[in-house]
């Protein structure tokens, strides 16, 4: 009977030692895992390995989105520039072309004093220097706009935005007319010369004046 009885103190010591050993092993594993987590270089290397080696769809296999967008934007910008350079000439109607030709024969010397100014409303005018300078600048712009309205065919009956569009078309028409006239006549103006070269050319072309003798002098026959 005594052989089958176990000492309680021995059983308790055995159990307690097993618990301590298992706890120590767990602590060692936790310490190793904690040290690995506290190492940022090791964590970064692990993430890089997982992303760039084991992930076939990583960013190394595909170009970045920003570079693709930049390339697309540059290509589209070049295409827009080519379209602007190759813009076809706008065809004008017969009525508008005749109106442009009539306007081109009118005088372009417009006195700003003859242009009617709009009526100013009764508002208080500030004496601040910045306000005065801004008001003068707006008045100069308005004066140039009114003169341009007189130069553009039908510009006095349009608002400012429509008149500016019409001015662009009118300038293009005038440039085409100048190009056509130059092609038809075939005349190319000579390059401008400075005054010194022009004086040298004139002296070589025109002969010197003949000598003049007074009353008491002898004639050319007597000299011979």
Curated annotation (Swiss-Prot):
Ranges of Basic and acidic residues composition bias in the record: 28-37
GO (cellular component) term, any one: nucleus
SUPFAM superfamilies per the UniProt record, alphabetical: HLH, helix-loop-helix DNA-binding domain (SSF47459)
Disulfide pattern: none
CDD domains recorded: bHLH_AtIND_like (cd11454)
Top-level lineage group: Eukaryota
Segments of skewed composition (Gly residues): 214-224
Residue ranges of the region described as Disordered: 22-42, 68-88, 183-224
Record's compositionally biased regions (Acidic residues): 78-88
Reported tissue expression: Gynoecium.
Keywords noted in UniProt: Developmental protein, DNA-binding, Nucleus, Transcription, Transcription regulation
Alphabetical list of PROSITE patterns matching this protein: BHLH
Compartments, record wording: Nucleus
Up-regulation conditions: Negatively regulated by ARF3/ETT in the abaxial gynoecium.
Subunit-level organization: Homodimer. Interacts with SPT.
Name of protein: Transcription factor HEC3
Organism in which the protein naturally occurs: Arabidopsis thaliana
Protein encoded by which gene: HEC3
């Amino acid at each position: 009977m005594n052989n089958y009885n176990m000492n309680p103190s021995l059983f308790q010591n055995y159990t307690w030692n097993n618990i301590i050993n298992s706890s120590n092993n767990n602590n060692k594993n936790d310490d190793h895992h904690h040290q690995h987590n506290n190492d940022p270089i090791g964590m970064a290397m692990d993430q890089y390995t997982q992303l760039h080696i084991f992930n076939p769809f990583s960013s190394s296999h595909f170009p970045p989105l920003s570079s693709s967008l930049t390339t697309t934007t540059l290509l589209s910008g070049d295409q827009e520039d080519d379209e602007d350079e190759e813009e076809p000439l706008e065809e004008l109607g017969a009525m508008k072309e005749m109106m442009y030709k009539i306007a081109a024969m009118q005088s372009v010397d417009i006195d700003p004093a003859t242009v009617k100014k709009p009526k100013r409303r009764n508002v208080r005018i500030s004496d601040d220097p910045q306000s005065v300078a801004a008001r003068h600048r707006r008045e100069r712009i308005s004066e140039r706009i009114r003169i341009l309205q007189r130069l553009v065919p039908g510009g006095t009956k349009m608002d400012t935005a429509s008149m500016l569009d019409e001015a662009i078309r009118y300038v293009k028409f005038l440039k085409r007319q100048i190009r056509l006239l130059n092609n038809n006549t075939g005349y190319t103006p000579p390059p401008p010369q400075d005054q010194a070269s022009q004086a040298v050319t004139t002296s070589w072309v025109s002969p010197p004046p003949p000598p003049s003798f007074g009353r008491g002098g002898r004639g050319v026959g007597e000299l011979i």
